[in-house]
Amino acid sequence: MFGKTLIRILVCMLAVMAGQNLIAQEPRPSPVQLEAMKKLQFLVGEWKGEGWNEMVPGQRRTSPIAESVQSKLGGMVLLVEGLGKRKVPGTQDEVVVHNALGILSYDERAKVYRLRSHIATGQTTDAEAKFTDGGFQWAFKAGPSLSFRYTVKLTDKGEWFEIGEMSQDGTEWRKFHEMTLQKLK
């Protein structure tokens, strides 16, 4: 009887000590992912400015835009939230014209940046992203014959300059969106 009790006590003690070892060994973030995400730290902060959309040629609509970019999970992801509002003509009312949330990360296995975005209408996109000539670009298909791509560059003044383009054939692109934002903090 005493032997069985002693064995139970020893087993319990070993289980507790093993659990403490697991707790003490916190998982470490991937250095490769952290290094890749450091290249995007220039986006972190609060940004405000103006932008325009022109989905139908000749029908451009301008509005104030704000973007908030936060580093999360110890630098492993960026959380990007954008909001644009425009005054309703003839009133003091505002209507939301841009309301988006994105999660930007680096996929170490595939060696690509990924952007998962959500907009207030419920639509989501999963896009691969990459660095281009002085900018950062992501693109996605919105159907069999419609593609979108966005490019963000930091200007010499330190402004966030972004363009959005659309294509029906993947070779000819038409700019439908542009915004210039100043960093507040």
Name every feature range the model reports, one short phrase each.
Residues 24-185:
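Hydrophobic small-molecule pocket/channel-lining residues, especially in calycin-type beta-barrels
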